[in-house]
Amino acid sequence: MYHLCTTAAFQTIYQKRKILDIQLNIKDFPSVGVTRFELATTRPPDAYSNRAELHPVAFRSANIVYFSQIVTFLQDFFLILSSMKRFALLIAVLTGLLASGCGGSATRSAADFTVEIYTPEYASGFDIRGRDKDAATLVTVRNPWQGAGNVEQHLLILREGAKAPAGLDAQVVKAPVRHVVCMSSSHVAMFDALGEVRRISGVSGIDYISNTYVNEHRYCGEVRDVGYDTNLNFELLASMRPDLVLLYGVTGENTVVTGKLRELGIPYIYIGDYMEESPLGKAEWLMVAAELCNVRDKGAETFRGIAARYNALKARIAGAAGGSRPKVMLNTPYRDTWFMPSSRSFMVRLIEDAGGEYVYTKNASDTSVAVDLEEAYLLASSADTWINVGPCNTLAELTAQNPKFADVPAVSNRQVFNNNRRQTPAGGSDFWESGVIRPDLVLRDLCTVFNPQAADTAELYYYKRLE
């Protein structure tokens, strides 16, 4: 029985090798050099009612799909192969013949999405495209971590009965998503800005999340803490069965996490908002969340409002500041090292748009650089205002780090401000959560700090003056 079944199947493959779009991957099987056999074709899995029947398709289309429905067939196939060494060479030849027609299918499938759905005005790390024949859209994410070089990832969003094209190298979800896991607090803020935060069922580090909905629903189990980085609770994730996990990368892809998510069959996508140098570019990533929730128009309207308020305030500050710009120092030492951001960073952009002048101009790279303490002290001494001073809540806490700080003019003049006005008991700052999506509010705060005469309010939202 096994012999007849597998022989017929093999003959079918061999006879149709010039018209089949299949790929055979072979590795170390006992006695014939094979332990793994993967078959791929454009035919949908449910078409395989007979394990020995293969669908003829154009040889060059080369769209790759793995079919679990023919696992039994493959097992049968191996049984006969193990006693038929003479087929080993033939299989190797077949593999080489077929491989020549398999290149580029994923690229071609992605290229089918030619309809412009959303092209960001400020962000550089993503775009959204569609295709004429259905409502599916493709989110393309580029270089979502430092040093990515030329990384490109795709998320295919299906809706209204659309089908995933065979061979597309993409994670696939159906919209609207119902259950999302957010690995960054800024992801939570994106859904909240759209009024869609109820779709979040999991977060990373729930004690550091400021969002009201998340905190109200954590104790009843509707929002779970899935853990951190490589210490993710995969057992919990598997039981939750989320539609999508939103990841972030710092220096590269976390292959341990992505590999396990693939194993569990949980779709994921990297969100690269933190890589954007423009404050509005960071906020514009909310359009990805809007696409996932089927609220594209609302997302566009929300972002347009944020951008309009930001740009209007920026223009007013530019007109009021004249030639006088307060010099601004950033950060405090970390383990005897003072990290100063690039003059291209989003924080420096905010300072400049708010009418300030960043004191450190040597770094024009895309990362922060370490500055020795003596140089940093001289920079702080030249500043009119000092902001983002780590965990400090009072001037006493700041000067306790280094008694010399008491002589810095910004300290003696009470011009030290920190971005931790809105903070969780565990120390999570809403500045790095909702502030990422509301740069208009951050700009208003900084305008109040640097140029109170140009501000439309004296009240601070994310910042507070250290006393």
Give the location of each predicted region.
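A short, structured surface patch at a secondary-structure boundary
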Residues: T137-T140, W145-A238, L244-V250
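Solvent-exposed loop/turn segments at secondary-structure junctions
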Residues: V180, S186-A189, I206-I209, L232, ...
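Bacterial Sec-exported substrate-binding components of ABC uptake systems
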Residues: N63-Y66, F77-F78, C102-V188, K298-M329, ...
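Sec-dependent bacterial lipoprotein signal peptides
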Residues: I64, V71-L74, F78-S100
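Extracytoplasmic substrate-binding proteins
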Residues: E222, S239, D243-L246, E253-T337, ...
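Short, positively charged low-complexity motifs
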Residues: Y2-K18, G33-E38, S49-N50, L89, ...
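N-terminal amphipathic/hydrophobic targeting modules at extreme N-termini
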Residues: R17-F29, R36, V57-F59
